[in-house]
């Protein structure tokens, strides 16, 4: 998948995030990125915190292992997850 690439020690996920949705869920690939809807609003970092929590739970890693690399204030984000391969991330996030 073009939205998940292996890097030293983990994977980088290219995401398109839609905050303030009715529920938090993965919608699928959209324009080369994985689209994720978040129930949290984009206020005071709530959506970013919800994204980190969602990814940590889905990938079965600690929240500290999920780091926002790019896109703190935008919808297009890059997230690094340590100790996870791209193949494992794809399997866990795309059902």
From Swiss-Prot:
Domain of life: Bacteria
TM region positions: none
Gene3D superfamilies named among the record's database cross-references: YggU-like
Gene Ontology, cellular component aspect: cytoplasm
Protein family: Belongs to the UPF0235 family.
Protein name: UPF0235 protein Anae109_1126
